[in-house]
Amino acid sequence: LEPLDSSDLLDTIVELQARAKPRRVIIYTGYTEEEVLAEHSQILSLSNLVIKYGRFVPDQPTHFDPILGVNLASPNQYAKEYNITDAL
């Protein structure tokens, strides 16, 4: 999702999903959930999508994100799943 104003974002994600089947597509972005959905609310209609939200904030403690299964660099970062089916 960099840059956020990409007009072909939905097409790009759909193409990635077609190539990744049956797996989930994970998008890492430094934007907030509100910023992403304000510009690209249509992504909510896609299936098997995971988005990691939140900017890196230096000098903050890391934390484990159970959706991604990794430590994220600052506590304001998190992942959210959208329309998960039987993806691997």
Regions found by a protein language model. Give the residues of each.
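Structural recognition of alpha->loop->beta junctions
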Residues: A38-Q60
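Short internal beta-strands
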Residues: I27-Y28, K52
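Conserved Radical SAM active-site core
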Residues: L1-I27, E33-H40
